[in-house]
């Protein structure tokens, strides 16, 4: 039986924290699907197509190195519904701290009620990436700060281009 996991998020932009979660996730499953949430009420910094390309270029080599099949997609419905549509039985969620855990436990409980066959697996962030959030990365980049310690090099370049001029 193939273990399919879905790792949902906005990935706006991809951070080293996301990469850390993927490095742990690819050893837990046979196929990892990264699902980018597209929400009508939100205006992301990077459009969905750019985020898909970013996710693919950063995460596919990590999955390949681990021998894990990889795919990425977008979704605009409930995360648990996206998992079911993708045939995933595992939802991967990264945890930075206790606040994340409290929030994610509530969601995991609701998801378990809606889709008993989809199980949430929490991946604790490595100490070096715990403080990183995409929101802070966007703010630092928007103010001309150096984000190279917080994101993959290709993402740092994309952010620099996005905020140039």
UniProtKB/Swiss-Prot annotation:
It catalyses: (R)-4'-phosphopantetheine + ATP + H(+) = 3'-dephospho-CoA + diphosphate. Belongs to the bacterial CoaD family. One of its GO terms (biological process) is coenzyme A biosynthetic process. The record marks 18 as: Transition state stabilizer. It comes from Nitrobacter hamburgensis (strain DSM 10229 / NCIMB 13809 / X14). Substrate binds at residues 10, 42, 79, 93. It is an enzyme of class 2 (transferase). Gene3D superfamilies: HUPs. This is Phosphopantetheine adenylyltransferase. ATP binds at residues 10-11, 18, 94-96, 104, 129-135. Keywords: ATP-binding, Coenzyme A biosynthesis, Cytoplasm, Magnesium, Nucleotide-binding, Nucleotidyltransferase, Transferase. The keyword Cytoplasm applies. Its EC number is 2.7.7.3. Its cofactor is Mg(2+).
